[in-house]
């Protein structure tokens, strides 16, 4: 067997495999004999069609089948011998049977070879979110909203109130357009964007007052729209007191006392923002290493990440994109992000390779024990059994390896903490 490897690009190669008749003859003759037994031609008894006629009729199909078998048989061995790291399945570009030899040309993508820049001198800032009593109370208030009562008030509307009013659309002369009236329209100001003209105009208004609202045109050809709102009522959400009885109802009997519920809210906030802090640090690290190591990513790998991002978006929208959604344009918009994911995977793999990182059964058991601690309904034995299973093992192994890679990076860079207030939640 002869083999010739041609570099097409940093991520693409071609492999030519040349086999002698002795190396593919057995398989070829087996398929030819099978064809002799099964091919039927008028005028010949089954199994007695001349070999020359068989070759003329089904020879091309046999040759294609043999080329596929020989490519599958030899590619993996050659990849191991030549230290090729395929990033895609090898595809047959062409093949030929000449002078008792078979030549097969394969194309495939590879993981590129590159030198990883040292990152020991890098410095990163990690936000350290501080949870205040006010933050805890705001979170509790959000929970209590589902148990609150809307009450009518005489005060001017605040940015969190609901304004009820009659709406008409005005024409250029300032007169009401026929058929445009809407009675008792509810404006929940809290859920309107701050720059929304209706929110701006209605904040500060009382029952009986009038507000004129001008909306910005969508384009130069569309005129601005003017609406007149006669405020009929302003309502404010009155929150209930956080009592032990209400806590039992809200928590499904998990907590009996308001103090315990409040402590749990604080704990949940602390855990959430600890994870957020870590995620933001890791995002900064990956962005820096991607910037400093402009490695080319295989198209197959980028396409895989693009598909993952699209499927994630579909799940967030209930399983499918809404009618009229331009999926093609969305995929194009996701392409740069998919390429970053692919490049970061290559960099992570390089760090793991340099540091001889691997994942053992003991690592998976330790991971399962930590996860079981977080979930009281999951026993350690169940977690270990699940994570060791064929269905989950690769995913868990990948997660653990990522953590090991990040630990290596964090041990060699400088990380400074910056006290940071938690961001205001957008309703």
From Swiss-Prot:
GO MF: peptidyl-prolyl cis-trans isomerase activity
Instruction: Give the main EC class.
Output: isomerase
User: Which reaction(s) does the protein catalyse, per the Swiss-Prot or TrEMBL entry?
Assistant: [protein]-peptidylproline (omega=180) = [protein]-peptidylproline (omega=0)
Q: Which SUPFAM superfamilies match?
A: FKBP-like (SSF54534), Triger factor/SurA peptide-binding domain-like (SSF109998), Trigger factor ribosome-binding domain (SSF102735)
Domain PPIase FKBP-type intervals: 160-240
- Give the EC number(s) under which this enzyme is classified: 5.2.1.8
Please give a single GO biological process term from the UniProt record: protein transport
Q: Which residues form the signal peptide?
A: none
Q: Identify the domain of life.
A: Bacteria
Classify the main location: cytoplasm
Sorted alphabetically, which keywords does the UniProt record give? Cell cycle, Cell division, Chaperone, Cytoplasm, Isomerase, Rotamase
Paired cysteines (S-S) = none
- Function recorded in the entry: Involved in protein export. Acts as a chaperone by maintaining the newly synthesized protein in an open conformation. Functions as a peptidyl-prolyl cis-trans isomerase.
Family statement: Belongs to the FKBP-type PPIase family. Tig subfamily.
Recorded protein name is Trigger factor
Upper lineage: Bacteria, Pseudomonadati, Chlorobiota, Chlorobiia, Chlorobiales
Gene coding for it: tig
């Amino acid at each position: 067997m002869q083999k010739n490897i041609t570099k097409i690009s940093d991520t693409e190669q071609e492999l030519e495999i040349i086999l002698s008749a002795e190396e593919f003859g057995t398989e070829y003759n087996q398929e030819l004999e099978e064809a002799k037994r099964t091919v039927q031609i008028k005028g010949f008894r089954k199994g007695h069609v001349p070999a020359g006629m068989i070759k003329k009729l089904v020879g091309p199909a046999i040759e294609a089948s043999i080329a596929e078998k020989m490519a599958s048989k030899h590619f993996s061995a050659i990849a191991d011998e030549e230290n090729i790291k395929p990033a895609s399945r090898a595809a047959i570009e062409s093949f030929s049977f000449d002078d008792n030899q078979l030549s097969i040309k394969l194309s495939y993508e590879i993981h590129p070879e590159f030198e990883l820049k040292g990152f020991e001198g890098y410095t990163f800032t990690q936000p350290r979110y501080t949870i205040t009593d006010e933050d805890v109370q705001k979170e509790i208030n959000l929970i209590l909203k589902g148990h609150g009562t809307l009450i009518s008030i005489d005060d001017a509307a605040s940015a969190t109130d609901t304004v009820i009013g009659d709406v008409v659309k005005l024409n250029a002369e300032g007169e009401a357009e026929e058929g445009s009236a809407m009675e008792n329209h509810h404006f929940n100001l809290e859920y309107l964007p701050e720059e929304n003209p209706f929110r701006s105009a209605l904040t500060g208004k009382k029952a009986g007052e009038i507000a004129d609202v001008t909306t910005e045109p969508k384009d130069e050809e569309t005129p601005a729209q003017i609406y007149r709102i006669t405020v009929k009522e302003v309502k404010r959400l009155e929150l209930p007191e956080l009592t032990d009885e209400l806590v039992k109802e809200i928590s499904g009997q998990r907590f009996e006392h308001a103090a315990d519920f409040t402590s749990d809210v604080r704990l949940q906030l602390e855990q959430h923002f600890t994870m957020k802090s870590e995620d933001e640090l890791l995002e900064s690290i990956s962005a820096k290493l991607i910037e400093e190591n402009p490695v080319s990513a295989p198209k197959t790998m980028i396409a895989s990440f693009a598909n993952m991002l699209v499927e994630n978006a579909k799940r967030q929208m209930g399983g499918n994109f809404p009618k009229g959604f331009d999926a093609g344009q969305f995929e194009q918009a996701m392409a740069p992000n998919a390429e970053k994911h692919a490049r970061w995977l290559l960099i992570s793999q390089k760090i793991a390779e340099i540091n001889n990182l691997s994942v053992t059964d003991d690592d998976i058991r330790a991971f399962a024990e930590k996860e079981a601690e977080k979930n009281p309904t999951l026993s350690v034995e169940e977690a270990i059994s699940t994570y060791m299973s064929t269905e989950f093992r690769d995913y868990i192994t990948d997660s653990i390896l990522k953590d090991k890679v990040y630990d290596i990076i964090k041990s060699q860079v400088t990380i400074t903490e910056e006290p940071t207030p938690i961001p205001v939640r957008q309703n």
